[in-house]
C-alpha cells in the first residue's frame, strides 16, 4: 500500500515578495508549512541579500516550474562603485577600494552599452552551481577556487536609473542564468574602480511581477500560522497562470479523452507550431500540448486529473 502523503493537496502558483536575509528555500518551507501543502517548489533561488518576486509552485503546478526557471528575469539593483568584495555583494568582505573617476551620464551609457546583448559570463564562486556535486559557495568558504566555464547569457535591457556617486542604480532584463553580482562587478572593472551589489530586487520572473506578489508573513505560533495561511490562500493563482505565454486550444470531449490517454489528435485549423495550453470544453486546464508540422497536437505535460478532483 502506498504511503499517504503528509499535508493537504494544493494546486496553484503563489508569487511571494521575498524579504531580505531569508533564503529562497526558507521562504518556501515557511509558506508550505503555513498552508500544510503536500508538495511545493520554488522556481529559481534569490540570494539572501535579494528581495522580490519568488514564484512558488504547489502540487500539479510544479510540473511547469521549469518554464519559470527558463524564463527571463527583471531586476533593479544598486551598485556601490569603488569597492569590490569577496562575494561581489554587500555580504562579503572588502577586497579592494579605489577612487571613483568623474563619470558623466554619457560615460556611463558608453560603458553600459558594452553589456547589452549576447554575453559570456563566468559564474561567481559564491553561487549555488555545483562542482562534482558540491555547491561552489561551499568550496569558496573553504578558500578553494575551481575553474568555471563561461556561460551564454543575454542582457535584453540595461537601463541607467540614477547615478549619485558612489551609487549606481540599474534596471536589468536578462535571460536565465544571469548573475547580477557578476554583471555589476564586470561593469565596475570596465569603469576602472570596481563595484559590488548593495541592493538587489527582482521585479519580474516570466509572466509574474511585483503586482502579482503577496507579502511574506513569518509566524511563531499556530494562530500566526492560520492567519498567514488565510492571507496566502487569497493570493493563490491558478495552475495555468505560469503558461499564459502560449496560445490556447479548447478540446471537445473526444479529443480531451484521447489527449489524457497520451494520444495525438488532429485539430484544424491551427495557426502555428509550438506549445499550446489545452482546455476541456468546460474551460478546465489539463496541461500543455505541442502543435506538430502536420497539424496534429500531441500531449507534452499533462495534469493528474484525479489529483485535481481530490481537492
Swiss-Prot record:
Molecular function GO terms recorded: RNA binding; tRNA pseudouridine(55) synthase activity
Gene3D superfamilies xrefs: Pseudouridine synthase, PUA domain
Pfam families from the UniProt entry: TruB-C_2, TruB_C_2, TruB_N
List of catalytic residues: 47 (nucleophile)
EC number per UniProt: 5.4.99.25
InterPro entries: PsdUridine_synth_cat_dom_sf, PsdUridine_synth_N, PUA-like_sf, PUA_sf, tRNA_psdUridine_synth_TruB, tRNA_sdUridine_synth_fam1_C, TruB_C
Coiled coil (residue ranges): none
Catalytic activity: uridine(55) in tRNA = pseudouridine(55) in tRNA
KW Isomerase (keyword) present: yes
Biological processes annotated in GO: mRNA pseudouridine synthesis; tRNA pseudouridine synthesis
Assigned keywords, A-Z: Isomerase, tRNA processing
Top-level taxon: Bacteria
Entry annotated with the keyword Hydrolase: no
Function: Responsible for synthesis of pseudouridine from uracil-55 in the psi GC loop of transfer RNAs.
Similarity field: Belongs to the pseudouridine synthase TruB family. Type 1 subfamily.
NCBIfam families: TruB (TIGR00431)
This protein's name: tRNA pseudouridine synthase B
Organism of this sequence: Hahella chejuensis (strain KCTC 2396)
Amino acid at each position: 500500500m502506498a504511503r499517504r502523503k503528509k499535508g493537504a493537496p494544493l494546486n496553484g502558483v503563489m508569487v511571494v515578495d521575498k524579504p531580505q536575509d531569508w533564503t529562497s528555500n526558507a521562504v518556501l518551507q515557511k509558506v508550505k508549512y503555513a498552508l500544510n501543502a503536500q508538495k511545493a517548489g520554488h522556481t529559481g533561488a534569490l540570494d539572501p541579500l535579494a528581495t522580490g518576486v519568488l514564484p512558488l509552485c504547489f502540487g500539479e503546478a510544479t510540473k511547469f516550474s521549469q518554464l519559470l526557471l527558463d524564463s527571463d528575469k527583471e531586476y533593479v539593483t544598486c551598485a556601490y562603485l569603488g569597492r569590490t568584495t569577496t562575494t561581489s555583494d554587500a555580504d562579503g568582505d572588502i577586497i579592494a577600494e579605489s577612487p571613483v573617476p568623474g563619470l558623466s551620464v554619457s560615460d556611463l551609457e558608453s560603458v553600459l552599452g558594452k553589456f547589452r546583448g549576447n554575453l559570456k559570463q563566468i559564474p561567481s564562486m559564491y553561487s549555488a552551481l555545483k562542482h562534482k556535486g558540491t555547491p561552489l559557495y561551499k568550496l569558496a568558504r573553504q578558500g578553494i577556487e575551481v575553474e568555471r566555464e563561461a556561460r551564454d547569457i543575454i542582457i535584453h535591457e540595461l537601463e541607467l536609473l540614477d547615478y549619485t556617486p558612489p551609487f549606481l542604480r540599474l534596471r536589468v532584463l536578462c535571460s536565465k542564468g544571469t548573475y547580477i553580482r557578476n554583471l555589476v562587478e564586470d561593469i565596475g572593472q570596465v569603469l576602472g574602480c570596481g563595484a559590488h551589489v548593495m541592493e538587489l530586487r527582482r521585479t519580474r520572473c516570466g509572466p509574474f511581477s511585483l503586482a502579482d506578489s503577496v507579502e511574506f508573513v513569518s509566524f511563531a505560533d499556530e494562530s500566526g500560522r492560520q492567519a498567514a495561511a488565510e492571507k496566502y490562500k487569497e493570493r493563490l493563482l491558478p495552475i495555468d497562470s505560469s503558461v499564459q505565454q502560449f496560445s490556447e486550444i479548447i478540446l471537445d470531449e473526444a479529443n480531451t479523452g484521447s489527449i489524457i490517454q497520451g494520444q495525438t489528435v488532429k485539430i484544424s485549423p491551427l495557426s502555428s507550431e509550438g506549445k499550446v495550453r489545452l482546455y476541456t470544453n468546460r474551460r478546465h486546464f489539463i496541461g500543455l500540448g505541442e502543435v506538430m508540422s502536420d497539424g496534429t497536437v500531441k500531449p507534452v505535460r499533462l495534469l493528474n486529473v484525479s489529483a485535481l478532483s481530490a481537492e
